[in-house]
Structure formats: C-alpha cells, structure tokens
A protein has these predicted regions:
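Active-site neighborhoods and metal-handling regions in enzymes and metal-associated proteins
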Residues: 2-433
C-alpha cells in the first residue's frame, strides 16, 4: 500500500538505512557481515543474477507503441522529464532539480533532448544507451538562457509550432508553463493516454521482474519473521528487513507498525515495542531493475489472550476472504470499480461497514515502475481490465485503538481471470506458506 515516497516520510527506518548502507559504485547493495546477522538472514542467498535488465530494443518498441497511441489520441508529441516515464522509454535515470532536462518524442520524426549545458557530458553518457542514442539531437542551454526556447525551436523545425503536446503528469508546473509561453501557438494537454496507455499493460519481461521482486520481498519478510523477539522496536525490525534485502541482492525497506498503531493504514512515527501477543504489520517492497514490489503481511508474535486472539483471527479471516473475492472478480473486461466492490461487500457483510468505516481506503493501485500508478481499484473507476495489467490487492480492517489487519499481494490480470504473484498469507500465526 505505502509508496516509496510515503515510506520515507512515515518511517525513520528508511532514512537510517539509506545513510548506514550506501550503494556500491556498481549499484549493488552493500552486503552486511553475515556474522552479525540472525541465522534466518545469514542463510539468505543473492538472487540478483535472476534479474535481466530491460533492453534497448524493448525501449524502442515502447517508443513505437507511444507513437501509435499519439496518433490515436491526436497528439503531435509528448514531453517527458525526470522520473519513471523517462526511464521507461529511454533507460535514462535523471535528477536535475530546478533545471529542466526534457525528451520531446514526436509522433513522427526524430526525438530531441533539451539539457543544461554543464550537464551535457552526463546527458550524452545516459542517452547513448537509449533508442537512437548513437547520434542524438541534444540541445543545450546556458544558465542565463531559456530551455523553453530550445523546446519551441525543436518543435518549429519539425513543423509542430501549432501542434498538440502531451505533458507527462509529473512534470512541474513551472516547466509546463515555460513551454506554453515559449510556444504560444502549441496546445498543451495531458500525455497520460500515451504514457499510462503504454505502462499499464506489462510485457512478459516486466511481469517476470515484478514477480521476482515479490518473491524477494516475501523471502525477506519470512527471514525477519523468524528473527523477531519481544522488546524489538519497529526500527529494529525495519533495519533487519533492509539487511535481508541486501543479503538477497537488492535494496528495499518497510514501514513497520506494532499493536494499536497497525490500525493506522500508513502508520505512525510513535516509538513502538513488540510485546507478547502484539500484532505486527509490515508493508512495502523492493526494486528489481526499476520494477517494484508492494506486499503487506500482518502477523502475531507469540500468544495474545484468548478473547483478543479470537477477534484477531476473525478479522484476519474476513480480510482473507475479501482478498479472495476481489481476486475472483478480476478478469478482462471487468471495471476496476467492480473489483473494489467485491472486496468491500465481504467486509461490510461481515459487520465491518458501512462503506469506508473500517475498510478505510480503496482496494488497490496499479503497480510497475512506480509503487502507485494507474489504474486504481476504486469505486467509480470505469477503466476495464486487460490482460497483463498489474495491481496491489490489499483489503484491510482497521479498528482504532485496537489493531489493524491488511493483506496485500500483487495481482496480474490473465486472459482468463487473475492471479497473485505470491501466495496468500495462510494465517496470523503462520503468515508464510
């Protein structure tokens, strides 16, 4: 459920991990000393070799698909800046802050880049791996010059002065506004029909990377589960999860909530300590070649009182049935909103309604290179499911002041229905298969 950005906000664990365990120059996570790890973590083996990178040919196919969608949506070009859509179509990892770096991809003709002059070396290094990167059209601008005029000039040279430009949804307003003023005859609109139109439908390679990410996440969670003990804080657990990911060859983290704080879907900064019978909720995932996992497991350490245990198990069973119901409802042609409704009905019929009272959020979100991306399992969303769409499936029941239980796995739509990339959690006491 929790996005990578949101995780950094709500959990002090992530920030500490990022400082304590920097990446090596190769991009591989620094592996901890096995002797300092609990046995369940020390025995983990790296799975990094199983992750096959996305190729230039695949990115070229994506650009051709984008051009087709531009034609279908009457767009003359799309403008991409730093972020996952730029990486999706080119493989470029870019950060630039307030200085604009952009790719303009026309429906017809050659793409061009606009880049700060002092960043030209870094830009050419990355562009060389992108489709058409051998001889790119790269337009630079000095610190006292306008990058927007470079965009306008590139459009003019391609006969697109009065064209319709799709702006990717994460582009900052100041950049979009600058382009609009420099190219006043152009019409600016959303690029989402093109960018999401490509990204919502995953290739077999993308699904394989996501499936590996999910398997790695469950392996990390299970190893940490066997190392839990009374007296640990949520930060202790988070540190172990980060260490487990490094053992497995990847970088990841988790938001960890204990006891009554598990009733807050996105958690709390309040210091929390695991006690006998505590519910522990672990949520988030890892990155495998740019593709994300997002899994939640809720478990109990030791034995709660009979009364509390009975209530917890009853709630777990309801949430489990809700997840099963949404999985059964999902298939090509079904609207996203109907999948949310299937899970919500189970929870409401079991007495945890009405509506959003205890199941306080939508059922799920699209998954891929972003932890949260289009489309969404939410009431009113009429987007129809298609094969190879991927989503989180994460019903939950949250009882303020007591506990919350959420189960989250990644769902992929198949030609005949849907399946989870990992098996459902069997129970609170035995959360792993």
């Amino acid at each position: 459920m929790i996005s990578r950005r949101r995780f950094l906000e709500v959990s002090g664990v992530a920030a500490g991990v990022a400082v304590s365990h920097p990446l090596l120059a190769s991009g591989a996570p620094e592996k901890p000393d096995d002797s300092s790890l609990p046995p369940s973590l020390a025995h983990l083996k790296s799975r990094q070799s199983e992750a096959a990178p996305i190729t230039r040919e695949e990115r070229l196919q994506r650009q051709e698909r984008a051009r087709k969608l531009m034609s279908e949506n009457a767009l003359d070009a799309i403008v991409l800046m730093e972020g996952t859509s730029l990486r999706y179509f080119t493989g470029i990892h870019w950060w630039g802050g307030e200085r604009m770096f952009a790719l303009v991809l026309p429906a017809k003709g050659a793409a061009f880049y606009v880049c700060p002059a002092f960043e030209e070396g870094r830009a050419r290094e990355q562009i060389s791996g992108a489709p058409g990167g051998e001889q790119p059209d790269l337009r630079t601008w000095q610190e006292d010059e306008s990058p927007y005029r470079r965009v306008a000039q590139g459009l003019k040279e391609r006969g697109l002065t009065g064209g319709k430009l799709g702006i990717e949804e994460t582009v900052r307003f100041v950049f979009a506004d600058g382009i609009a003023k420099a190219a006043p005859q152009a019409t600016l609109t959303s690029a989402t029909p093109v960018t999401a139109g490509c990204r919502m439908i995953k290739s077999g390679h993308e699904i394989a990377l996501m499936r590996l990410a999910c398997q790695v996440t469950l392996a990390a969670y299970e190893a940490v589960y066997h190392a839990l003990h009374e007296g640990m804080t949520q930060h202790d657990v988070g540190d172990l999860i980060a260490a487990a990911y490094r053992q497995l060859g990847f970088v990841g983290g988790a938001s960890v909530q204990v006891g009554e704080y598990s009733a807050l879907p996105h958690g709390s900064r309040t210091p929390q300590v695991i006690r006998e019978g505590s519910i522990v909720m672990i949520d988030d995932g890892c990155d495998v070649e740019g593709y994300q996992s997002d899994i939640t497991r809720t478990l109990v350490l030791g034995k709660a009182s009979e009364e509390v245990r009975s209530k917890m198990n009853n709630v777990f069973d309801i949430v489990h049935r809700a997840q099963s119901a949404s999985l059964a409802a999902a298939r090509p042609g079904v609207e996203c909103g109907a999948v949310d409704a299937a899970a919500r009905k189970v929870i409401t019929d079991a007495g945890y309604g009405p509506d959003y009272k205890y199941f306080t959020h939508r059922l799920g979100h699209g998954m891929g290179m972003d932890g949260h991306e289009l489309p969404y399992f939410v009431r009113g969303n009429t987007t129809k499911l298609q094969p190879n769409m991927t989503f989180s499936d994460e019903p939950g029941i949250y009882i303020p002041g007591e506990f919350g239980i959420r189960l989250e796995d990644i769902m992929v739509i198949t030609p005949g229905g849907a399946e989870l990339m990992t098996g459902q959690a069997p129970s609170l006491e035995h959360p792993f298969e």
